[in-house]
Amino acid sequence: MNFEFINIPVYLARLHFLDPLLVGKTKINKNDNCLDKIWLFKNSNEVHLLVNGILANLRTSIACEAGVIDACTWGLNEIMDNVIQHSEAECGFVMATIHKKTKNINICIFDYGIGIYRSLKKSTIHNPKNAPDAISLAVQEGVTRDKSIGQGNGMWGLYNIVNLNTGMMSIISGKGGLSLNRGVMRTFKEIQMLSQSQQATT
């Protein structure tokens, strides 16, 4: 099935919404702006280049309190690595934005893989009942599909970083969702999804 898009808003075109930037075809230099663009990544080397580029822009765009850059570094690496290790998708996508007036950093990481629920169902240890249950498990310490490829602390660590800084975080995967907003956590179910095999995670 092919789609034709007409009259694309200038803002979406500038973000590369329909044509994400490929790290392999775009040389990222230290002076390049990696923010406000959608990037596609396929492997750990591309993750490394993107994380370094995004963090370089963060440092020069906004004055961050102690520990913020380290937290962003850790969170980006962990969650983007989750895409490579667990999603079974060919690639993932990432975009980072800074709102200078509010001093907020927004980061979105997406993949169209099998989803957290189907990934954890392959585990011999964990047996989530549904997608919301799987997401709630994923933000607990030490939960992973396979201990040989990860310690299971990525989502848990990011959740705690956001929580301690009274930030906001949302996870949507398959039919389930979880939101954390200034210390208040909620889960959602029966979210619409396009494909049973590619449940996707954001």
Where does each model-flagged region fall?
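STAS-like cytosolic regulatory interaction modules
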Residues: 1-57, 67
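Flexible, glycine-/charge-rich segments associated with ATP-binding catalytic modules
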Residues: 22-32, 45-46, 124-129, 140-202
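Helix-loop-beta hinge of the Bergerat
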Residues: 34-64, 117, 124-141, 160
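Conserved ATP-binding N-box helix of the HATPase_c
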Residues: 66-101, 159-162
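Short beta-strand element(s) in the Bergerat
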Residues: 103-107, 201
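Acidic ATP/Mg2+-coordinating residue in the GHKL
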Residues: 111
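Glycine-rich G1-box
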Residues: 114
